[in-house]
A protein has these predicted regions:
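Buried hydrophobic core signal strongest for RNase H-like alpha/beta domains in large
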Residues: 1-382
Length: 382
């Protein structure tokens, strides 16, 4: 954090804060009575790393489910458009417009509400291994879990999911590795399972899209969109301020504009309102065609196989941008809805994006999560 001191001298300092979430006493949130089974499964799974072939199999397996979600997104863009007027559409209650079923979602309702406790902020630099160790000790002091008896109980019985940004997660994994040969389960940090926060991952995804598709004011990228929409301050990705919020809004606006124009192109309609004459089933069919022909890897590959004299590089760029915009919107909606299975389906493609985009840090985070989900975690920890 930065702030002004007397004499107008700028001063930089570091601090750490944390929030404790306690799940309700419900079967869906039950962790094992002891962490012995969890530790054994982790140790066994670590000996069998997930392979590239297995990751690609997960990617292929998830593709049909992601396609269904993308079709629904494109369909909702149409019916939610002001020109369509869903509330007065004859078939507004059609099941075609309902959200596709998902296999795994977080339970909702008052019975599943989490208790939340904000801890005191401390002047500790969490960016270092030493700082993370200091913070662990301070946190357990605040929670009154720093007695020998409580430490023993934590080491043998408790499993604590520790979520943070990429740097925090990386430091905690490194700290666990450094202390893996210590004497007790508590000192070895066997009770702690670090996991990255999805909000930070989503910000990295948005930054990756900005870097890849910024382009020029004369092209089809974001630079031209910013100019047309009158967006200011989005030219370079920033961590501070409201850049992410403003850029995410622009992503949604650009995606909506792209796909509404495709609706008109593929149906031959002169306006969005004209599509009210179509049945829900017809609209759903058109949405499938839009995703397949204008926003899929298959469409991109088909374009790339054309003879050099027939290739349309501009069309290829638009198809790729549309595909990646849908992927971002899918991740955003899955997180907001608590649809865990949809988030998990996106992990392989997120890995490919971060690895290909030279974001090695989040590529490692995705690899770690895939390894834990498919090799190391017990079912109740998942």
């Amino acid at each position: 954090m930065s702030h002004q001191r007397a004499g107008h001298n700028s001063h930089f300092d570091s601090g750490t804060a944390a929030t404790v979430f306690i799940p309700p006493d419900e079967p869906d949130y039950k962790l094992p009575e002891t962490n012995e089974e969890f530790v054994k499964k982790m140790a066994k799974g670590a000996k069998t790393p997930i392979t590239p072939h297995e990751i690609q199999e997960l990617h292929v397996d998830a593709a049909p489910r992601i396609f269904v979600q993308n079709v629904h997104t494109v369909l909702r863009m149409l019916v939610n458009a002001s020109g369509f007027g869903l509330k007065t559409y004859e078939h507004q209650d059609s099941p075609v417009f309902e959200h596709p079923l998902v296999s795994e979602a977080l339970p909702t309702g008052l019975a599943y509400a989490l208790d939340q406790f904000i801890l005191h902020t401390c002047k500790i630099d969490e960016s270092t291994y030493d700082g993370n160790e200091q913070w662990l000790n301070e946190l357990f002091r605040q929670l009154r879990l720093d007695t020998d008896e409580e430490k023993e109980k934590t080491g043998q019985e408790r499993t604590i999911i520790w979520s943070g940004d990429q740097l925090t997660t990386s430091r905690l994994r490194g700290l666990k590795a450094l202390r893996s040969m210590d004497d007790t389960p508590y000192e070895q940090l066997c009770w702690m399972e670090p996991i990255f926060g999805w909000f930070h991952l989503q910000m990295s995804f948005a930054t990756s899209l900005h870097k890849q598709y910024y382009g020029t004011k004369a092209g089809v990228g974001f630079a031209r969109a910013f100019e047309l929409l009158g967006k200011k301050g989005l030219g370079s990705a920033k961590v501070k301020g409201n850049w992410f919020h403003d850029f995410e809004e622009t992503l949604e606006e650009v995606a909506t504009a792209h796909f509404l124009s495709i609706w008109l192109e593929i149906t031959g309609a002169s306006s969005i309102q004209d599509l009210r004459s179509k049945s829900p089933e017809e609209l759903h069919h058109f949405a499938e065609c839009i995703v397949l022909e204008f926003a899929s890897t298959a469409a991109l590959e088909e374009e790339s196989r054309r003879p050099p004299t027939e290739r349309d590089e501009l069309q290829e760029q638009i198809i790729q941008l549309n595909r990646d915009l849908l992927e971002y919107l899918e991740l955003d909606n899955a997180i907001k809805q608590g649809h865990v299975s949809r988030m998990e389906d996106l992990l392989p493609s997120l890995l490919y994006r971060f690895q290909g985009g030279n974001n090695k840090l989040y590529a490692i985070e995705i690899m770690e999560l895939l390894q834990k989900l498919h090799k190391e975690w017990t079912d109740n920890v998942k």
